Amino acid sequence: MGRSVWVSAILMFAASACQAEDGLASYYGGRAHHGEMTCAHRTRPFGSMVVVRYRGHSISCRVNDRGPFIQGRVIDLSVRAARALGMMSAGVVRVSLE
């Protein structure tokens, strides 16, 4: 049983790592995130890690929510993640996801 869970986890990580995407990113506030490096994505598994790249900067954040539900946007970042990426003043930016 333990081995099959481990193999499933590896396969899930590998599948999510292969899902490169380009599109728009925005950020959202709220007390629910407690200053964490988190994000919302429509399809990636909860708890998976996403690498977000913007203008030479890159961050890793954990998927803990669903969204964004605005056409053209591929990810919503927590305030801390947006600040680390350097996109706070722009609000919405074009990013690459890995």
What spans do the regions from the language model cover?
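Secreted/periplasmic proteins
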Residues: 2-98
